């Protein structure tokens, strides 16, 4: 299975896969050497150091973490490991009688706050 076991050196040229990102801005689950979504089995010591730096205790300081992300992004751009071929947006239609609805990333209680302002169904 090429998704979990690295193929032979000459078995393939391109791997195409997709995933969605977690709300935690860590790239470990996508690009670390043992990541399940690292479909191309990319492994680079400099990127590994960058990933570990992003998630280190020092990165609890937002300024430090931002700088660590910038370095990681620069290194990833140099290596061109990932070439985006697709982009999508999520569309969530909500009518006027829905209250308490938010798609904000920081909202942790959406489903306990959402409701409707009327028992009467919306007609338009």
From Swiss-Prot:
Lineage of source species: Bacteria, Bacillati, Bacillota, Bacilli, Lactobacillales
UniProt KW keywords: Cell membrane, Lipoprotein, Membrane, Peptide transport, Protein transport, Transport
Disulfide cross-links: none
Species, as recorded: Lactococcus lactis subsp. cremoris (Streptococcus cremoris)
Gene3D superfamilies (UniProt xref): Dipeptide-binding Protein, Domain 3
Subunit structure: The complex is composed of two ATP-binding proteins (OppD and OppF), two transmembrane proteins (OppB and OppC) and a solute-binding protein (OppA).
Similarity-based family: Belongs to the bacterial solute-binding protein 5 family.
Subcellular location: Cell membrane
GO CC term (a single one): plasma membrane
Highest taxon in the source lineage: Bacteria
Keyword Mitochondrion set for record: no
An annotated GO BP: protein transport
Keyword Membrane recorded: yes
Role description: Part of the ABC transporter complex OppABCDF involved in the uptake of oligopeptides.
Record membrane topology: Lipid-anchor
Name of the protein in its database record: Oligopeptide-binding protein OppA
